[in-house]
Each structure stands twice: as structure tokens, then as C-alpha cells.
């Protein structure tokens, strides 16, 4: 690898019709204190001016690399980005989100301190407004106080690394000690304490390219592809470092995902967890109960979305109801799964598996 590319971070950003927000996202990358990066913007032939904006920004900054492609989904775009990336490290960013200025510096420092394969930071839920940041429980945060606390989290990592400055060129191999506020997980801990605890996002992560190798996103999944990418990586990594520092702003829909109507693509959530069940049961058998309980919950969530549809429309999805029923049955039948279910789901799964039509009718009446 050329010395110029040594230590470079390749940021992969798929986009389609994102003119309203991609400028803010790209600007947050240009404001990074770590300057050794390239940004691959994979544009699925946008029709709203996104393409023109990205090319204009690329003229201003040669690190921005627009790539026009056929519209065939986020996973295919990320895979193309992986093929074309020149960096030693990889990061995925969604075009409607943004980064804290210290994010790349902090994650790079963590890889150097811990010699781990992945470095992960926490994130804010963000409504797109200057002061609209939320914690995990969706409570609005006091922006100024939180900004100071988060800067302190970043400073602990950078001071420990000795790189509290802009534009670090490469990960230093000299330390293998995590900074305060950074925890290093081995592979089993990463599965049990992180992936299977709701942390299945592929963004807010800095990956060593060598750890990814030939692993790619599954293009047959429209939901759950992030989780399966991380699951597929498991056998190629040794450790993961995770910090409390929040470096990523994840744009939220203030109406809430649960209010979105059912779409057939939601069934991919079940498919992805069925794949995960097979992998976890084989490689991490102690987590069998946990992963199968998640499969059951994913079946219940999809069934709940179908239940909220008007009666005539709901009848169109009888095949999907059967698939949900099968997933829930399979999930709760696994050893240890019932004990892992959230309490509210223990009664729900019992009713749904016993009489699906009654459950759907009751759920429809309750929610509507």
C-alpha cells in the first residue's frame, strides 16, 4: 500500500435522493480533526439534485469521490464501496446522519491503544435540529452540558493515546492498554453483551480493513443486513473496543418506527435472525436461548404491524402471518429462550402461538 494511503480511513456513504441532508453530513466529515480519509459517495442515480451537489463538493475537496451506480439498494452500494475503497480502515456512514468532529480521531486512537479489530462509539438520537439530541430512552438532553461531558469522554481517549491533535496519520502500535471509559470485548463477550443486546448497527464503527477481508453485506436482505454483516465478521475478529463517547448523530423519525405501516420487506428481519440463530447456535451455544428469544420477538413485531392494518388489507398477508407464527414457535421452543423473553412477550407469544387470529384481532382493536 502506498505510504500516502497508510492509515487512511475509507468512509462509505450510500445515498439516494438525499439533497436535503447530505450536505450537512459531508460537512461534518470535512470538519474532522483527523484529516486522513477518503469519502466514497455511492449515488443510486438520485433525481433531486443530490448528484450535482456531491460533484460540486468533490470539486472543492479531492477526498470526496462521487460514484454513480444503478439503483439496487444500500447493501449493494456498501459492497461496491468496499471493492473501491483504498484505505487501511473502513467506516460506514448514512447520508442523513452526521459525525462529531472528534469521531475519527477517537476511534483511530482506540484501535491503536487496544490493538482490537473494531472500535465502536456510542451515538445520539438526533431530530435534525441544532439542539435536538436524545439519549437511548429518547429523553431530550441539555445540549450544552452534554456537549461538555462528551468532549471530556473524547479527551480521555485522546490523552491516553498521546494524539490529542488533528490529523493522526496512522494507528500507533505502541500501546495495548485501553483508555478510561473504553472496554475491550473478546469475541464471545461481543456477542453476548453487545450484539445480542440490541447493538447491531454497522455505523459508528471503525473497522480494520484486514478484519473485513472478503466479508460483504447480504444483498438479499433489506432489513437486518447490518446485523448479519457483523455476525459474519465474528469468526474473523479477536476483539472489539467500545467507548461511551458519542461520536455519531443518528437522525430519527420523530413519528417513530412503530407507526410505519407493514411492508413485505419487514419479513427480512425474521430471515436475518433465523440466519443469526444458526450461526450463534453453532459457534456460541451458550447464547442459544438469547438469540432464539430475539427471533421470537422479531416474529411478534412483524405480526403486530400486520395486525394494525385494516381487515381487508390484513387478509392479503396470510402467508406472512404463517411465517411470523412459525418464527415465534421456533423461537420459544429453543432451550432457554422463554426465560430470555421480556416479560410482556411471554403472554403475547403464548396467545399468538395458540390462536393467531384471535391475537391479531385483539391487537388490532387495542392499537387502533
Task: Please give the residue ranges for each predicted region.
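Membrane-interface aromatic/basic loop that binds lipid-linked glycans or pyrophosphate carriers
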Residues: 153-156, 162-165, 169-172, 308-368
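Donor-binding/catalytic cores of nucleotide-activated saccharide
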Residues: 95-241, 248-266
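Short, acidic, metal-binding catalytic loop of nucleotide-sugar glycosyltransferases
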Residues: 27-36
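A conserved acidic beta->alpha catalytic loop
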Residues: 35, 43-52, 94
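Glycine-rich, basic loop-to-helix element that forms the pyrophosphate-binding segment
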Residues: 69-85
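Catalytic core of nucleotide-sugar-dependent glycosyltransferases
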Residues: 238, 246-253, 259-287, 298-332
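Short aromatic/hydrophobic "clamp" motif used to bind/position activated sugar donors
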Residues: 90
